[in-house]
A protein has these predicted regions:
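Charged DNA-binding/catalytic regions of mobile-element recombinases
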Residues: 1-228
Length: 228
């Protein structure tokens, strides 16, 4: 596809780092859930573990906007995302609600046993965020503050987003980023491509959504009476 050709032509293999903007700020008054993941992000099925984090995107005005992601650890599929002009917890809660609604619509709703893992940023330790997790069928798990290894899968996905979607020479950009809507558009297009077309090496060069579909097809095929 055009995106893949442009990526190869540009030789994109990593992120060119600029001055880091701090997005993870802990709330010293907030209670924190235990770390139920302990850096073990490989799971045998969807809906067992989702990871979450957010990053910043700089507009041409110098103002930052923020993009939050919810990622299923099984195939790395992005199941929820939201862009916001502020770092208030509303936008990370919205990403969670999107993930829950998507899984319900697909007939595979989140259960109370689904773990939601994030860092210890204040957005993810707020009371309202905890309520959103509970209502969405998720059990909280919290890593440390600002340690990339404690949330490595989310950090990796965000790195791909910054490289493949946000960079000035990205094929998903239609020009300078003037406003929040510009970031929302490029994010929507990148997420769709990432889920449906990006070949993932750890999935034997299969896109995330296809890898999930193959898993569910195997489940159906092994059910009693499936071949009757």
């Amino acid at each position: 596809c055009t995106v893949e050709r442009l990526m190869r032509a540009n030789g994109w293999h990593g992120v060119t780092r600029t001055k880091k903007v701090r997005t993870t700020v802990a709330d010293p008054q907030a209670s924190r859930a235990a770390d139920l993941v302990d850096r073990q992000f490989r799971v045998p099925a969807p809906n067992m573990l989702v990871v979450a984090d957010f990053t910043y995107v700089r507009l041409v005005t110098g103002v930052f906007v923020y993009t939050a992601f919810v990622i299923d650890a099984f195939a790395g599929r992005i199941v929820g995302w939201e862009c916001s002009a502020s770092k208030h917890d509303r936008f990370v809660r919205s990403a969670i609600r999107q993930a829950a609604a998507l899984r319900t619509a697909e007939g595979n709703p989140l259960s109370g046993n689904t773990i939601h893992h994030s860092d210890a940023g204040s957005q993810y330790t707020s009371v309202r965020f905890g309520e959103t997790l509970s209502l969405s069928g998720l059990t909280p798990s919290i890593g440390s503050v600002g340690d990339a290894f404690d949330n490595a899968l989310a950090e990796t996905t965000i790195g791909l987003y910054k490289t493949e979607a946000v960079r000035a020479d990205s094929p998903f950009r239609r020009g300078p980023l003037h406003r929040l809507a510009d970031v929302e558009l490029l994010t929507a297009e990148w997420v769709h491509w990432y889920n449906t077309s990006r070949l993932m090496h750890r999935l034997d060069r299969t896109p995330p959504i296809e890898f999930e579909a193959e898993h569910y097809a195997r489940e159906v095929a092994t059910q009693p009476g499936a071949h009757q």
